Amino acid sequence: MYSKKYTSFVIVLILSCIISTCTSNQISEDVGKAINQKLNENIEKVEDVVVQFENVANQVIEELKVEHQRQELLGEVKHDSLRDSATNYIWGLLDKIQSYLPKDNNKVSKVEEAFSSGQNNNIGSSIGDSTGASTSPQFQSINGLSGASQSSGSSTGGTGDSDSKTTNEAIIFSSKVSTTDRQESIIGQVAITAKDSLGATITGLGGVSSTAKVGGQITNGRAQGQVITGGDNTGTVGRGAVTTASSVANTVGEFLGGSRTGGSSSAGTVGNVISDSYTSIGKIASGNGNSLSETIGTTGDTLAHTFAGTDSVGVTGFHIITKTFNLIAGGKFNSDQQYIDKSYGSIPSQDNEEIKKRLQSAHQQLQEQSPAIYQSMKSEDLKNLDDEVIRNTLKEMQIQRENQDIGQQNQEDKEQLIDLQNREPGLYKNQQDLKQEKRANQQELINYELNLQEDQEQYELLLDQLYDEQQQQPQKVSNKQQLQEQQINSPEDIQYQLNHLNQPFQDDYHNDQTEELKDDDYNFNDQQINNGQFENNVEEFPDLNDANDNFEQVNNNNNNINNNNNNNFKVDKSKKSAQQVEIALENERLYLQEVEDAPERLYEEIHNSNLNKAVQEAEEIERQQNGNGSPAVNSHKIVTQMGNVENNEITNEQDAIEQAQHLQRIENGEDIDEYEAAQHEVAFLDENEQDAAKLQNEMDQLELLLEENEEEQFSNKNLQQLNENENQQQQQGQQQVQATNVEQQIVEQLKVIKEFQRQDQQKKQKIQQENDAVYLSDVEKAQLELDAELAKNNKQENQDENLVQEKQQSPDQIKNQLKNIQHEQQIQEQQDKLNQEKNQQLLEQEQNQK
């Protein structure tokens, strides 16, 4: 019986343990499933937020690269244009956010509420708290968008709720640091806080004495909450106790860029990649550090400042859009100098101290140098001064950083070169040889260019010399005896020589004068225009009288020579008389004697004198001709002609010698047949002597007629040549008259231009005087109004003094007097400002006149 009871008790106990264990395991399993389900839902929401920001950031970066490349191709890279492109995507993001808001007539307040902090169900608080770092800088509000129970936020974080707006306009998205601003029923708050959260709602899951803890301790030896959250059984995700290794919260924290303390941030996380700093997603969006938001924003023209405007929260949508495109896209309305590159990233504390020192120094220096100006400056002027100092300081810092980067890069290059020299001496030597060879080639190219330049200069100098020689007066032929000694055998040669002497000069002169008239080669200045003096390159037409005289003398001499030769030939062939034979024999004897006595003299006179002189004269003429036929070809013609003359003379000389030898043989009786034939011929000639005399008379008459015809023909040719020369001189005179007319026209045009310039200058001066008069009249009018206002105030002051004397002043009267005094001070300030503007205008006018 006992054994049965004991056995039953053991069985019941075992069954109880089994049931208890199964129940505990089932409860733990159910709790784990519920927790995992809710946790996964919230993690998905967080991941969605991260992905959205990551996509936007990547899209902005890619578009910035494309825009930057496009502007580099166009050569007009401007930071404000890049900023405009980036802000366009921010506007697109705002439109997407607006689509998720309640459709309540799309009021602007909905956008403001969406980006406000400290409100339930708003995007700013939800995204910030969903990161699991509720006390860290969060993406909770847009700078300046604050209202009742809303936090304006700032780059360094606010300490609570307030209605004031931040003064730091350099940050688009502000952050907030507060431990008392947890809200209920928001994303993240539901999952991470103890009150009304997931842990508290599901039967105290994650609590200190919750079933999860008990079940975890019983089954796993560790609380489920601690395993999931890494915290001390609080059920939160990413709170201060996120330190346990390999916990879910710690992993999520690293993925998002770090916990609130930044201790779990590591390279490769989403937050670190986007912001390049150990900050959370909330801090990335808030603009702290080298973030996307701060890079897009610039001083004084951020999206937040534009969205908030300068008035209260309740600005109209039209006002918001107008100010947005007027200020954000400021490149269309303002100069580039009004913007600075915000790619400097986060400003270190020592740089902030330097900026503060420079701001203080600038204010102190201005106050010491111009106290009146400093006192009259408004808050806006002081703000512009501060912005300028900040811009200059940041630019100097950026230049210093770039110089440091360049120095570091140079040092790295040197180290790489040394390493290359140590590892690969041959390759290093080859590179050095290539560099030296490149330098040598460059030096050789430079030397070649220098030599080429010198050759070009020498070539231009030779061209100038040839041009000067061409422009000189042609040499006149004055040595008539030299031309008379030339042996020219035909009138064609004489005509060729005449054309050779004179025609090139006429053609060259005509061509040169035509080119000079086309080039309009006139040099004159104002003084010469007024004095009627001009410089030109018109030359006198060369005088051809001497050349014509020489030609006439040479022609006459050669005609006489030709006539004598023709007469001897005709007489010998017609008369056939012994007397002529004897005369011819005697002439041949004398000629042979002369040849025997002075052969060298004859050769020098015929060959050297005639030939060389003709060739030299031809070459001299061709050098002055400049283009009318090749000098070498013409000289060759002269040489050929003179060679023919020489050959003819040698042939005549040989014939004369043979004829003299033949006559000598006849005279000596060596050739009887020839002697008898000569006797018969003499007899025959005697019989026909009368006929020969008659024929001689006829021949003489014919010769006289021939001479008269040749003289008349030559006279006609000479007269024709003279007429042509006269016509050319007349044409040249007409061209010179035309050139003079052109000069006069140019002078008249210059006078008209000068008169027009003088009238234009007078008009400009008159307009300037009228503008000055209008400005002075406006200033005087304003001065009169100020004087009248002062007089009115003085009168009122006197009346107030009289009232004071009559009765005791009341508090209201004292306030009125204070208002009058302030009004007078304002009027005085306006008067000082007008005087300052007047002085500035006068200074600018004097500078313009100078």
Curated annotation (Swiss-Prot):
Residues 119-130, 144-154, 837-850 have a biased composition (Low complexity). Induction: By cAMP. Residues 787-798 have a biased composition (Basic and acidic residues). Keywords: Signal, Sporulation. It comes from the Eukaryota. Residues 131-143, 801-820 have a biased composition (Polar residues). GO terms for biological process: sporulation resulting in formation of a cellular spore. Residues 1-24 form the signal peptide. Residues 119-167, 787-850 are annotated as: Disordered. This is cAMP-inducible prespore protein D7. The lineage of its organism: Eukaryota, Amoebozoa, Evosea, Eumycetozoa, Dictyostelia.
